[in-house]
Structure formats: structure tokens, C-alpha cells
Amino acid sequence: MEISSRNVVDGTSRSPHRAMYKAMGLTDSDLDKPFVGVCHTGNEATPCNIHLPQLALKAKEGVLDGGATPREFSTIAVSDGIAMGHEGMKSSLISREVIADSIELMVRAHQYDALVGIAGCDKSLPGTM
């Protein structure tokens, strides 16, 4: 099985990439393991997503226990309850596509080998899947 993350860490031409990771605190041992993205839609815009950063911490612990290197990132979530009844409602449905696209971009750009997606509402769940 191909390990995509090797594209960003293996070989002398990837020394600058490794330097970026090391600037974030990763070790050579961390870089030798598969990279698993841990994405959440946690934010302070909606109550169903506000707790997700804490769940992401637990997911990262699980990734570490499984022998991989977690890489956390977040994406948006729009609250229908707050966006309702004004111009903001036009943003709600499209937010699913933005969530999906932003996750795909992060995974592709950083060559993550796997993804744990954590979401909490009717738009962020399908966008994350």
C-alpha cells in the first residue's frame, strides 16, 4: 500500500518540508509514521459544534495510540438557527460543499494517509463524510 505522506517527507528534496514539520514540533520518529488528518468543524457559531475541538484531542490520542502521527485542522460550520430569516440563509446549504472541498484540499495538499472527520450538525456531517 502506498503511503501518501512519504511524498512530503522522504528524500533530500523534501528537506524544506521536514523543516516545516520540525518547526511545528514533530520529531524524526513522528515523520516516519503515517500522517492522519483529524478535521473538525468546531467553532463558536453553533452549539452543536462548539465541543468538537475537545473531541478532536481524543481522536488525536487514538491516532497516536494506533501508531500514526495526527495532524489537526478545522473547517467551517454554519448555524441554520442563526442564519435563518435573513440573507445568511443563502449560505447554509452551500456550506456543505465548502466543508467537503476544504477537507479534500487539506488532505490532498498535505498528502495525509487517512482522515478522522468530526462534525456535529446536518450540514457539517455530510460535508465531512
Regions found by a protein language model. Give the residues of each.
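Metallocofactor- and cofactor-centric catalytic cores in central/energy metabolism, strongly enriched
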Residues: 1-129
